[in-house]
Amino acid sequence: MTLKTCLTNQLRRKLNFLFKPIQRKNKSAYTSKVMTYAKYYKKNNVKEYQILYQVRDGKSITDSPYAIFKSLIQQPRYRKYKHIWVVDHHETLLFYKARFKYYKNVEFVIKESREYLKALTESKYLINNSTFP
């Protein structure tokens, strides 16, 4: 093995040692979501009349957030508000879309989707009964 080959191999190993963890982290789903959220947070403006609701990580539409939603949706002075509910799966989204199809100002997003991250950065009001990510 020549000196040049030996030095090249050592340099390659050291660079891999330094950069592989960074490359792995950048490819992770979690890092991708954090970066997307940060991009939306920087780019998007807060919408004055938008409310995001999340109950039990999107598993249901119940509890205090639902009571608040029902109260707001029935009052004429809150008609201009857009209500966005977080759901956990596509099937849940379809179920609630059908249930609330007559409400033009009610939408649903799947938890941790791009639409969810966008709504999280744009909504002036965040209503939940647990914690947001």
Give each language-model segment a name.
Residues Y49-P133:
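Active-site and donor-binding regions of nucleotide-sugar-utilizing enzymes
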